[in-house]
């Protein structure tokens, strides 16, 4: 039985597109990429020869290339094995690409069901219409995302401030012109397997001679498949990794150095990062007050603890949470509200640069619209420079002025956003755009669903 089980496991891994199956059977999950892990999960689901598979968010947080492969795999397995599949997802593009029928749920109840063609082109329920309108457009740039106002569980509207008298106004008044971030010849290699002799080490060139510049006040996108090096570049700029060689300058100050001089510390204060997962990036044991106050206390930007609380209260109001959130813990908030806390923490040091590393990939489309609109408002009001990392190409089109495409640690194209999406010059850029999930498989959406005017 053991040998038969091994043989079946090998066959299952081959059926889901995993090569070198005998060796892979002995590997651990952390040794697989995200796409390969998802293939293994699909193989596990097939092991019992089921008639029905339930796929719960099977492509969430996967880049467009891996997402397309997983969806194609699910479709082909359904045809070959005559399987039924229930896809649970917040990605309407996935539904458009794979499903025959769809049921839309809100507040625990099914509010609309029907053929995918019918639901996408002529939805009848207000919630379905709002969801479809909130999907970022990959074919057209709009000023704002259409938000679903009754979704996010208590988030207040964005509150504009009087920058002439507000402490955040100091950020705008102090914003210099010119290049905010300059990267020149940046390299980073990770050692995957250590060995006594250098020739026996296994290494990965995560960042390969990357050079780029981002202007003050610009929103700059970084896209690429998983493992392309985009998040590593962000972490190098933020000082979370140390580069092997190359230069990183923040408003002209070289920060690609190990020592922490006063100038480097001051430059780092100008830059803050919003991480991908709002569920793991916040300390579960800290109250929101202490989470947001941490950079204020670290950089000593308040004269007293009373002033710290006043600043935290003000920031929470500003991002739409309200002062009542101060004494709560992260587990008491929804995903979108937690990401607002992350944004509040990033603003607390009065930065001039925000690095947003996949800030909405863990959120559904309705909450995503709220967070992206908030980031747009903050950038416009405070004059922030943004480095926006995402594998979601429609989000990049809506959020960024220019885009760099990364592959295997190197930049293969930098262009204005509209130019990249309309006339990409590099074959890999065109490949990514071709893989982008589209909602208009059955024709263009009605004008009422085409996004905000």
Predicted features along the sequence, with ranges:
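A short, surface-exposed alpha-helical micro-motif characterized by mixed small hydrophobic
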Residues: 95-97, 396-398
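A short, proline-enriched helix->beta-strand linker immediately N-terminal to the Walker B motif
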Residues: 47-51, 348-352
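ABC ATPase NBD coupling module
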Residues: 2, 118-123, 196-201, 255-272, ...
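Conserved ABC ATPase "signature" region
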Residues: 4-23, 306-324, 433-434
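Short catalytic/signature loops enriched in Gly
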Residues: 19-22, 116-182, 193-198, 417-453
């Amino acid at each position: 039985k053991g040998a038969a089980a091994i043989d079946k496991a090998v066959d299952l891994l081959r059926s889901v597109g995993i090569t070198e199956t005998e060796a892979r059977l002995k590997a651990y999950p952390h040794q697989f990429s995200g796409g390969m892990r998802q293939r293994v999960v699909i193989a596990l689901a097939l092991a019992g020869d089921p008639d029905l598979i339930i796929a719960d968010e099977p492509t969430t947080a996967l880049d467009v290339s891996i997402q397309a492969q997983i969806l194609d795999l699910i479709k082909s397995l359904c045809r070959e094995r005559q399987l039924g599949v229930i896809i649970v997802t917040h990605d309407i593009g996935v539904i458009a690409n794979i499903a025959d029928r769809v049921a839309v749920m809100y507040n625990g109840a099914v509010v609309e069901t029907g053929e995918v063609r019918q639901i996408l082109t002529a939805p009848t329920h207000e919630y379905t219409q709002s969801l479809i309108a909130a999907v970022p457009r990959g074919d057209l740039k709009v000023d704002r995302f259409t938000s679903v106002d009754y979704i996010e569980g208590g988030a207040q509207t964005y509150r504009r401030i009087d920058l002439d008298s507000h402490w955040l106004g100091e950020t705008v008044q102090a914003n210099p012109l010119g290049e905010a971030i300059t990267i020149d010849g940046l390299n980073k290699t990770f050692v995957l397997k250590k060995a006594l002799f250098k020739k026996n080490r296994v290494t990965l060139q995560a960042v390969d001679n990357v050079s780029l510049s981002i202007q003050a006040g610009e929103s700059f996108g970084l896209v690429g498949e998983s493992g392309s090096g985009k998040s590593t570049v962000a972490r190098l700029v933020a000082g979370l990794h140390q580069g092997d060689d190359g230069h990183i300058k923040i408003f002209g100050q070289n920060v690609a150095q190990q020592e922490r001089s006063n100038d480097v510390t001051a430059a780092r204060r100008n830059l803050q990062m919003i991480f991908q997962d709002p569920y793991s990036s916040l300390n579960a044991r800290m109250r929101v007050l202490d989470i947001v106050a941490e950079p204020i206390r670290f950089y000593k930007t308040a004269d007293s603890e009373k002033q710290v609380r006043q600043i935290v209260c003000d920031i929470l109001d500003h991002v739409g949470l309200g002062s009542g959130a101060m004494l709560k813990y992260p587990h008491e908030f929804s995903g979108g509200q937690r990401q607002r806390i992350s944004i509040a923490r990033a603003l607390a040091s009065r930065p001039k640069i925000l690095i947003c590393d996949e800030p909405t990939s863990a959120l559904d489309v309705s909450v995503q619209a709220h967070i992206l609109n908030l980031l747009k408002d903050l950038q416009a009001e405070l004059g922030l420079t943004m480095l926006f990392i995402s594998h979601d190409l429609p989000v990049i089109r809506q959020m960024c002025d220019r885009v760099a495409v990364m592959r295997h640690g190197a930049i293969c194209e930098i262009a204005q956003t509209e130019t990249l999406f309309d006339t990409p010059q590099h074959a890999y850029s065109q490949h990514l755009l071709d893989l982008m999930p589209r909602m208009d498989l059955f024709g263009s959406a009605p004008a009422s669903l085409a996004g905000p005017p």
